[in-house]
Amino acid sequence: MELSEIRKNIDKVDTKLFELFEERMKLAECVARTKTSTGDCIYKPDREQQVISKFSEPADEDMKGYYEALIKRVMLISREYQYRILNEDTPADTEAAMLSADTVTVRFTYKGFPDNIVTAINDSGAKITGFTMNNSEYSISIRHDSCKTGIINLLKMIESESDNYSILVPEISVSDIPK
């Protein structure tokens, strides 16, 4: 087979991939809107692992690692898109809501998407009340009563153990937390 013919075939496959990707992103938008309306969180590590496991088992052993890398990247892009939609659906007074008396706002920068922080917050049982992002700067609002779970200390620990994060955590004391 000639190189030009191989390239034409690759172009056909790429066209199909683009169409499927667009379809997947439209479905991801539906997922984001559904999760937003039910108050569910976007990032579900168990679901992502289920998808990876489900489809990597029958894969050609030589391709398994490549497939896993591809699907992880697609899910990351999907998550970023869903968070953007969540951010668009947030009322215009997001900043005011994030600074309200019943929330603590954690601001941080990160190159890439902050799965560690989102997972840590979700795993702690803390309630995220707002999420905004602008390039690599993120703001997450957490209910004050979530601070009782030690989430602020957990976030500070993540920052101290990683060069990827710069976290601005407000200093709060127990007396600042509503009873």
Predicted regions, residues:
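Domain-level signature for soluble enzymes in the chorismate/prephenate branch of the shikimate pathway
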Residues: 1-179
